[in-house]
A protein has these predicted regions:
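Membrane-interfacial helix termini and adjacent extracytoplasmic/periplasmic loops
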Residues: 2-4, 46-50, 59, 94-97, ...
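Transmembrane-helix boundary motif in ABC transporter permease subunits
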Residues: 2-6, 71-102, 115, 163, ...
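Membrane-embedded alpha-helices of multi-pass transport/permease systems
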Residues: 27-35, 78-85, 112-115, 124, ...
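Feature of multi-pass inner-membrane transport and sensor proteins
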Residues: 171, 187, 224-230, 261-289
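Interhelical loop and adjacent transmembrane-helix boundary motif
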Residues: 5-11, 51-57, 213, 219-260
Length: 295
């Protein structure tokens, strides 16, 4: 019998190294997390999961986190898709500067963005003080609405980045063919452009959902008692009332399961729109003014 020899070339070594890193930094931590959630003092128990689902304060955090993530995802798509569309199809004044500013929003830590909005719209914030001088009270950055608002401004640039690439991959001949058949304006956008970019839209939606669901900095600063998964896990590990590692591990396992379900739903939906776009004729930018000069 002849045995094939493994070729230890550069790429095989890289592949093996990546596999080892994957096992160490992903599989092993999740395995330990699962073990900690069902083993207490060396005994198998589901007490941590029972405690989680027995109190509304705990299990409502599932709905709070998912609700925030869905709202942020929807708002980010509503902002990001039109932004990317006009940037990709039109020569707007200052378009490059706007795109750079949009990218800068993704580079700051969540704590920085949340704290900045506290300075603007907190109880003693600049905008809050101006509104109070005009007799407008009750405007606050804290709570559910504030979390959604701050996270949306932080995450919608991810949609812009994804959709800008997708729009530029559309073959201009398809758009010209649609126009020749009478499909123009909003109808062309819905029936042609949106259909061609649907896989990218779903991918961007999943990314925003996951980032929002896992965000800790924004809810802990402006949540004001609105419990979310990351804050709940943090409080169990480093809370003022002591630590409960097993309960925190159980909450983390539930969070992993929720994100896995969302991922499966996204993959199932994206499989319905699986195709490849090759822009043999890139999209021609339209001018919004008589000047053909790009900003």
């Amino acid at each position: 019998m002849s045995h094939s020899k493994v070729r230890w070339d550069f790429w095989n070594i890289i592949s093996g190294g990546l596999m080892v890193l994957f096992l160490i930094f992903l599989v092993y931590p999740i395995g330990r997390l699962l073990k900690e959630s069902v083993y207490t003092d060396g005994k198998f128990t589901m007490e941590a999961f029972r405690m989680f689902f027995s109190k509304s304060y705990y299990y409502e955090s599932i709905f709070h986190s998912v609700k925030i993530a869905f709202c942020v995802m929807a708002a980010s798509l509503l902002l990001g898709i039109p932004f990317a569309y006009f940037y990709s199809f039109f020569r707007l004044g200052g378009r490059k500067l706007l795109f750079v500013l949009c990218l800068l929003c993704t580079m700051s830590a969540p704590f920085i963005g949340a704290y900045a909005w506290i300075l603007l719209m907190g109880n003693s914030g600049l905008i809050t003080g101006i509104l109070k001088s005009f007799g407008i009270n009750g405007v606050s950055i804290y709570g559910f609405g504030g979390i959604v608002f701050v996270q949306t401004l932080k995450l919608f640039p991810l949609v812009v980045i994804y959709m800008n690439g997708a729009f530029r991959d559309i073959d201009n001949s398809l758009l010209e063919a649609a126009e020749s058949m009478g499909c123009k304006g909003v109808d062309r956008f819905k029936r042609v452009i949106m259909a061609l970019t649907m896989p990218t839209i779903l991918a961007a939606a999943l990314l925003v959902f996951m980032r929002s669901f896992a965000d800790f900095g924004t809810p802990v600063l402006i949540g004001r008692g609105y419990s979310t998964f990351p804050v709940l896990i943090y409080n169990q590990y480093l809370g003022e009332n002591g630590t409960n590692y097993h309960f925190a591990a159980a909450i983390s396992v539930i969070a992993v399961l929720v994100t896995a379900v969302i991922f499966i739903i996204q993959k199932t939906a994206s499989n319905r729109f699986k195709f490849t776009i090759n822009a043999l004729h890139p999209v021609c930018l339209l001018y919004t003014s008589p000047s053909p000069r790009d900003s």
